[in-house]
Amino acid sequence: MYTKRIVLFPISIIVMLLLACQSVTNNNKSEETDDFTLSSIAVSNGELLDAYMCETKVNDVENSIPLSWSNVPDSTGSLAIIMYHYPNPNDTSSVNCYLLLWGIDPSVTGIAYGEADDGDWFMGSNKDGTAVSYTSPCSHSAGMHEYTIDLYALSETPPSLPTQSTIEVDYTVLKNAIKTVKIIDIASLSFSVVTE
């Protein structure tokens, strides 16, 4: 009987230590920073406000959607943005792209309305490949159209990308370049445009 107590005592201590370690681990998880998030004052209740649709072109350039984000991961070396839309939701092989940005410093926390082409970063082609610009949603077909903006937290700016804005960088070029570096996290914002 005495021997059994000696054996059980160390075992009970080990169990208590394991439970204590588990508690510490769980507490550490709950203290992690909030999620990496992307938002826009141009979006309300999941829909793009009318004021930000069908922007007027001036020299083939349109005012860009305002964006803001928070909780960029600490290890981020560079940010990139892609805004896109599938004309046919059932066919993701065909995509229209509305905003392409790369080389954004991780200290940046947003882009003001109309300022996407005027920051310390680089911009790719518009939807039609005719200019370095943002393209605003302006569908002429009736129905609901969904758009998505992905904000990439990257380990570094993809070295294959040019260090200047150019129409040579389209959706495919930027997506493929992003795949060559570590993607730390992605913050996404999706919204709809309803046309009659």
Regions found by a protein language model. Name each.
Residues Y2-F9:
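Bacterial N-terminal signal peptides that target proteins for export
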Residues F9-P10, G103:
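Intrinsically disordered, low-complexity segments enriched in polar/charged small residues
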Residues I11-V15:
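Hydrophobic helical h-region of N-terminal Sec-dependent signal peptides
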Residues L17-A20:
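C-terminal motif of bacterial Sec signal peptides marking the signal peptidase cleavage site
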Residues Q22-E196:
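N-terminus-centered regions that define maturation/targeting leaders and the start
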